Design a protein with these regions (language model features):
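Charged, low-complexity terminal tails
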Residues: 1-112
Length: 113
């Protein structure tokens, strides 16, 4: 699939006359939106596409907030004391990420253009 991803990005970049990074960003955003639909709640999803290989990984992430602030968006936030249990060096306004299954590129990449 990674070769297909690169071919797709190159084709869209040439046809639409936009930079490859813009196309990669659109593909990442489309894949993230598709992945969000597979999860319950208003989760925060990030997709990272390797610009050289075309491989991509998908992450669910939580924003670290101060303990005293409480959770305003429970599906997207984690309290600092809970985050430190997983990552002792983490600070407020950083993110904890967990790898989740990636959706297949299929039509999603084409729709991103």
């Amino acid at each position: 699939m990674n070769r297909e991803m690169l071919m797709l990005v190159d084709a869209i970049s040439r046809e639409k006359n936009v930079e490859r990074d813009v196309v990669f960003g659109a593909v990442e955003s489309a894949l993230a939106q598709a992945t969000k639909k597979l999860h319950q709640g208003d989760v925060d999803i990030r997709v990272a596409v390797d610009r050289d290989s075309g491989d991509y990984e998908t992450f669910r992430r939580w924003h670290v907030v101060p303990d005293e602030a409480g959770l305003q968006l429970p599906d997207q936030e984690i309290l600092l004391f809970e985050a430190k249990e997983e990552m002792p060096d983490i600070e407020v306004d950083e993110y904890i990420e967990e790898t989740v299954d990636s959706v297949p590129i299929g039509r999603i990449g084409a729709m991103a253009a």
